[in-house]
């Protein structure tokens, strides 16, 4: 009888021990999983580009005042605050356009509102870094703001034809566009960065953009790289003669935002993400904070 009681006690002990061991194993497994679902930015610029506004060549005074305004919002922190609304947790502000009326003193801005976060629409309202700057510039000049939304290819042309005063459309400075407009001083330095899962070591030894590009060139057609739709990252992955990007073997997957792309990467649906450096840092910090 005593032996049976001892055997029962031993069985209970073993049962409790195995249950505890299993629980510890599961917790350890969860911890390991969490380590692999964070995101890291490879701190190497894949591209370098400068954004500026394109002013009517026949309005040198507007060019001068716009350059003064750019210097002002850079120095007093206004530009940084605007950017934070779109790259961090700030609240973007709606910008409204007046109706074009040649009898009024208006600032007529040409844009292509399909380039979030620089310019985009929700309903009849405009949003984006460029659009908020446009509103402040119009206020600074004491003018009423009119926004003319058009195809991207027509933006600089409309200014050269004096249908609009200034082009504000995430414009990279280049010689071809300088035939149509006079560029202001740069207000935004853009570069593309690569985001990878934190357990990926493929790029650990990379020191330059060429090093990263060489690794990306080894991707397969079955691999997928996420980008925010319409951005330089998309051209980098797909290839573009205008941008002198050869393209990558991997398939380009577009998303409405960089956040959606990074989350899809962490879910295992794509391999990497390529987006602008500033949003790359903000997005990974925000997503990793809740992992």
What are these regions (language model features)?
Residues 45-91, 131-140, 197-214, 219-220, ...:
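Extended ligand-binding regions for polar small-molecule ligands
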């Amino acid at each position: 009888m005593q032996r049976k009681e001892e055997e029962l006690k031993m069985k209970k002990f073993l049962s409790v021990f195995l249950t505890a061991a299993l629980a510890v194993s599961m917790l350890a497994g969860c911890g390991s999983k969490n380590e692999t679902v964070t995101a890291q930015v490879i701190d190497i610029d894949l591209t370098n580009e400068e954004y500026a506004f394109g002013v009517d060549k026949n309005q040198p005074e507007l060019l001068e005042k716009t350059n003064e305004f750019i210097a002002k919002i850079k120095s007093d922190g206004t530009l940084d605050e605007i950017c934070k609304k779109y790259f961090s947790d700030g609240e973007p502000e709606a910008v409204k356009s007046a109706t074009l009326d040649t009898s009024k003193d208006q600032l007529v801005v040409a844009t292509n509102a399909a380039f979030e976060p620089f310019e985009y629409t929700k309903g009849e309202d405009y949003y984006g870094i460029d659009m908020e700057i446009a509103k402040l510039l119009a206020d600074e000049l004491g003018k009423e703001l009119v926004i003319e939304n058009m195809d991207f290819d027509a933006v600089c042309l409309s200014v050269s034809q004096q249908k609009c005063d200034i082009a504000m459309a995430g414009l990279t400075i280049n010689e071809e566009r300088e035939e149509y407009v006079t560029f202001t001083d740069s207000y935004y330095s853009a570069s593309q960065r690569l985001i990878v899962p934190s357990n990926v070591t493929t790029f650990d030894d990379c020191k330059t953009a060429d090093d990263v590009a060489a690794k990306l060139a080894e991707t397969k057609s079955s691999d997928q790289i996420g980008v925010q739709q319409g951005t330089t990252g998309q051209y980098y992955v797909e290839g573009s003669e205008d941008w002198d990007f050869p393209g990558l073997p991997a398939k380009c997957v577009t998303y409405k935002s960089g956040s959606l792309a990074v989350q899809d990467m962490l879910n295992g649906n794509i391999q990497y993400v390529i987006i602008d450096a500033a949003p790359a840092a903000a997005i990974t910090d925000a997503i990793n904070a809740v992992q």
